[in-house]
Amino acid sequence: MNTSRLFSLLFQGSLVKRIAAGLVLGIVVALISAPLQETIGFNLAEKVGVLGTIFVKALRAVAPILIFFLVMAALANRKIGTKSNMKEIIVLYLLGTFLAAFVAVIAGFVFPTEVVLAAKEDSSSAPQAVGQVLLTLILNVVDNPLNAIFKANFIGVLAWSIGLGLALRHASDATKNVLSDFAEGVSKIVHVIISFAPFGVFGLVAETLSDKGLVALGGYVQLLAVLIGTMLFTAFVVNPILVYWKIRRNPYPLVWTCVRESGVTAFFTRSSAANIPVNIELAKRLNLDEETYSVSIPLGANINMAGAAITITILTLAAVHTLGLEVSFVSALLLSIVAALCACGASGVAGGSLLLIPLACSLFGISDDVAAQMIGVGFIIGILQDSTETALNSSTDVLFTAAVCMEEERKNAA
């Protein structure tokens, strides 16, 4: 493929092809920026990295407003007595997280990994106990709605949008139409932002690879292999089984669509919250029920944490093996599940699951000092770990939503 053809893909053709072109160009720029720096006097990758910063900033800026109006409009316009699929979707979210943790525990014991602990990282913002995490979650729910939108507190935004949406179900049709128009207007803005995804990916890839490179990951190859291998197993074995249970047909076309169109973008933005607009656009193209996906996808970004369950479990067990501690399989599973479920308090933040490592480690009696160093390990491998984790988390949001919607269609057609 010549250069002109590669550049043309950034401006026309399918979004997936354009993102792929941006990925290739980003890698090329990252590789040539260092040799060119002496000649041109600046690091080219750092300069184009601003494109990625702008793209992620735009997604994060629009996401709270999109959630607020979309969820509120969907609930306000829902007819009283209408059947909801949310219970089935939430069950899938929780079951998927549980099975991800289960697979991670198995992988952690089958492939025991020891690491050379890095220098201390600041973990002062990490929760110290389950009670503290739950308290933070409750405080986020009752946050001021304007403050929640300004600070992108997605738990608070979701709580207020659900509350107002339910309260406005008895409002006049004119009021409901205004809410729908606002939701549609924000959705159009989202569509414009997503069309710039290839440029965002180009900037993100160029800057990230130029800054850290793949050499930094060399000392943690086994840990990365276990982490990413477990996530891939969950994405392409565990999740398809759950989807088949719902739709009763070959799940892989749907799985691949969600991974390709949601997971790829989430891999580079490294934020489930920033990927919410992408998932909503995909749900529209899949012709899913808007009243369902407008609520389930933002909710999934906060509670569907399969990738976080894997990260917390694998890294905690790595600390256990490094220290030579003896922990029973059942204890490891139960304690890791508790930590993974509490991870919803750190959702929507790139690398947020790493802050839950001290919580999981404390359940095994591991000191805060060691736990803080494990956070440092997480940051070192974060270039791949956090990206893969977010891709799994976010693509699963739309995957499970689609599975439940398709199950409903199958039952109605029967």
From Swiss-Prot:
GO terms for biological process: serine transport; threonine transport. This is Serine/threonine transporter SstT. One of its GO terms (cellular component) is plasma membrane. Belongs to the dicarboxylate/amino acid:cation symporter (DAACS) (TC 2.A.23) family. It catalyses: L-serine(in) + Na(+)(in) = L-serine(out) + Na(+)(out); L-threonine(in) + Na(+)(in) = L-threonine(out) + Na(+)(out). Involved in the import of serine and threonine into the cell, with the concomitant import of sodium (symport system). Keywords: Amino-acid transport, Cell inner membrane, Cell membrane, Membrane, Symport, Transmembrane, Transmembrane helix, Transport. One of its GO terms (molecular function) is neutral L-amino acid:sodium symporter activity. It is found in: Cell inner membrane. It is a multi-pass membrane protein. Pfam families: SDF (PF00375). Gene3D superfamilies: Sodium:dicarboxylate symporter (1.10.3860.10). The chain crosses the membrane at residues 22-42, 54-74, 89-109, 148-168, 189-209, 223-243, 305-325, 337-357. The keyword Membrane applies. Disulfide bonds: none annotated. The keyword Protease does not apply.
